[in-house]
Curated annotation (Swiss-Prot):
InterPro entries per the UniProt record, alphabetical: MTA_SAH_Nsdase, Nucleoside_phosphorylase_d, Nucleoside_phosphorylase_sf
Subunit structure: Homodimer.
Gene3D superfamilies: Nucleoside phosphorylase domain
Entry GO MF terms: adenosylhomocysteine nucleosidase activity; methylthioadenosine nucleosidase activity
Protein's name according to its UniProt entry: 5'-methylthioadenosine/S-adenosylhomocysteine nucleosidase
Pathway the protein contributes to: Amino-acid biosynthesis; L-methionine biosynthesis via salvage pathway; S-methyl-5-thio-alpha-D-ribose 1-phosphate from S-methyl-5'-thioadenosine (hydrolase route): step 1/2
Its EC number(s): 3.2.2.9
N-terminal signal peptide: none
SUPFAM superfamilies for this protein: Purine and uridine phosphorylases
Ligand binding (substrate): 78, 152, 173-174
Catalytic activity: S-adenosyl-L-homocysteine + H2O = S-(5-deoxy-D-ribos-5-yl)-L-homocysteine + adenine; S-methyl-5'-thioadenosine + H2O = 5-(methylsulfanyl)-D-ribose + adenine; 5'-deoxyadenosine + H2O = 5-deoxy-D-ribose + adenine
Length: 232
């Protein structure tokens, strides 16, 4: 099995990249893909860039170039669930756009025309991620992750998301675009991210301070998942 791993920022991929054995690099259209092995598992690690367009472009290149069997989206996220703190883990059971609105034509909030209302994550890899959580004894929440081209920093956008998507546990800027492309290709995916900030009026300060913590925690999670795959 080959596992595709996607992070948006340098800080979100650097620890995993350093762990890749027999590493080779592929660059195109501002994206970087690193292939090799981690824990004996074939991986293709993509640094996509920030936002939905960059994520969709990079995911398409990853799926065409490396043809992974599954995609794990890793990195940082803003926490929405009350039980989440910096360094805790979120696992997607589904993802939605929070900034798409074609409700005038009968679609659900966050649903893009011609697309599912939500993109469900792969149940087998959700279970694998949960097993890794149990082994590492980390605090984690499983649920809806929402994505949009905005860093949520302030009461008004936060209230809008919580009102429109009351079940959302985390917010970030790439996961749904990644899932959308995976859906088009028929490739299973799961989002496993660590909390860098709790979405509120000071979230930009928390993000700057705790991004490295989130990167370390999400890297631990991905490595634990890969170790479980290697043991099968």
């Amino acid at each position: 099995m080959k596992v595709g791993i996607i992070g948006a920022m340098e800080q979100e991929v650097t620890l995993l990249r350093d762990r890749i054995e027999n590493r080779q690099t592929f660059q195109r259209a501002g994206c970087e893909i690193y292939t090799g092995q981690i824990n004996g598992v074939e991986v293709a690690l993509l640094k996509s860039g920030i936002g939905k367009v960059s994520a969709a472009l990079g995911t398409t290149l990853l799926l065409e170039h490396s043809k992974p069997d599954v995609v794990i989206n890793t990195g940082s996220a803003g926490g929405l669930a009350s039980t989440l703190n910096v360094g805790d883990i979120v696992i997607s059971d589904e993802v939605r756009y929070h900034d798409a609105d074609v409700t005038a034509f009968g679609y659900e909030p966050g649903q893009m025309a011609g697309c599912p209302a939500a993109f469900p994550a792969d149940e087998k890899f959700i279970a694998l991620a949960q097993d890794a959580i149990d082994d590492l004894q980390l605090n984690a929440v499983r649920g809806l992750v929402v994505s949009g081209d905005a860093f949520i920093n302030g009461a008004e956008p936060l209230a809008r998301i919580r009102t429109t998507f009351p079940k959302a546990i985390a917010v970030e800027m790439e996961a749904t675009a990644i899932a959308h492309v995976c859906h088009q290709f028929g490739t299973p995916f799961v989002v496993v991210r660590a909390i860098s900030d709790v979405a509120d009026k000071a979230s930009h300060l928390s993000f700057d301070e705790f991004l490295s913590v989130a990167a370390q925690q999400s890297t631990r999670m991905v490595e634990a998942i890969l170790a479980k795959l290697a043991a099968r």
